[in-house]
């Protein structure tokens, strides 16, 4: 799992992460907060943002009254998050940490966005779900999202290339990602390239890595094994988007019994 923290995206270019990946954070956090309240996790509850990245979701949820702890394997992303929390410093904290090793029965809810695709082995996936179950209080809420295999194959076969160019204080930055599909292992083979042009000099970083997509049956099995029930599936952080409508699976679940 430490492999992820070596990606230039998460290390030397962590400072540019939010420039390259634009998410509707406030809109999605409004939905997340509504789901939390619906499951009994009210403002004032302690929530873990597992794999928090630059902390934007943690900070927004703290503004909505939650007590948020964000952890990530990348020290560089955590450094960005700690510089960004601004006026909500009393409601949010950040630390380098491993989502497979969590304190027992501490949290009312856990949020895990886009992280679980980076765990490619069965044992690692099992360990993370065991950690989530152990870290949640009884009736605690788990909200996560993953890439769904069949829809991801369809999308990446149609759109294998992603490129974005942004102007930054450090120069012109071009990010390119190319995805190939390994059907046999149900994995995405991804090649990333950062090109930073500063004062006529170009710096290039390249990195290849693997993502393993998910299928709903696998999620159902792991959630049931670790005593999660009351499952709701969506295709986005939007109650109006049905599962299967996008290449994402968003799951809201509740820990219904003692951890396995």
Task: Outline where the language-model segments fall.
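C-terminal lobe and adjacent flexible extensions of AdoMet/dcAdoMet transferase-like proteins
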Residues: 210-260
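SAM-dependent methyltransferase
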Residues: 143-218
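A short acidic, Gly/Pro-enriched loop at the edge of an enzyme's catalytic core
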Residues: 102-110
């Amino acid at each position: 799992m430490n492999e992820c923290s070596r990606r230039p995206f998460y290390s030397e270019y962590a400072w540019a992460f939010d420039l390259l990946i634009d998410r509707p954070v406030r809109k999605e956090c409004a939905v997340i907060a509504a789901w939390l309240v619906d499951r009994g996790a009210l403002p004032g509850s302690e929530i873990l943002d597992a794999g928090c990245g630059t902390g934007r979701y943690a900070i927004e949820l703290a503004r909505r009254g939650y007590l948020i702890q964000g952890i990530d394997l990348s020290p560089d992303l955590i450094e960005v998050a700690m510089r960004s929390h601004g006026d909500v410093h009393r409601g949010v904290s950040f630390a380098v940490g491993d989502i497979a090793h969590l304190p027992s029965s501490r949290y009312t809810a856990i949020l895990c966005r886009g992280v679980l695709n980076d765990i490619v082995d069965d044992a690692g996936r099992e360990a993370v779900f065991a950690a989530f179950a152990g870290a949640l209080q009884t009736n605690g809420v788990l909200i996560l999202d993953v890439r769904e295999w069949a829809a991801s194959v369809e999308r990446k076969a149609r759109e294998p290339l992603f490129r974005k160019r942004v102007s930054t204080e450090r120069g012109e930055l071009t990010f390119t990602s190319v995805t190939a599909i390994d059907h046999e292992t149900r994995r995405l083979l991804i090649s990333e390239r950062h090109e930073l042009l500063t004062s006529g000099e170009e710096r290039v970083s390249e990195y290849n890595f693997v993502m393993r997509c998910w299928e709903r049956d696998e999620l159902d099995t792991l959630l049931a094994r670790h005593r999660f029930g009351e499952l709701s599936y969506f295709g986005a952080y939007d109650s109006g988007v049905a599962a299967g409508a996008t290449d994402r699976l968003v799951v809201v679940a509740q820990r219904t019994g003692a951890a396995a």
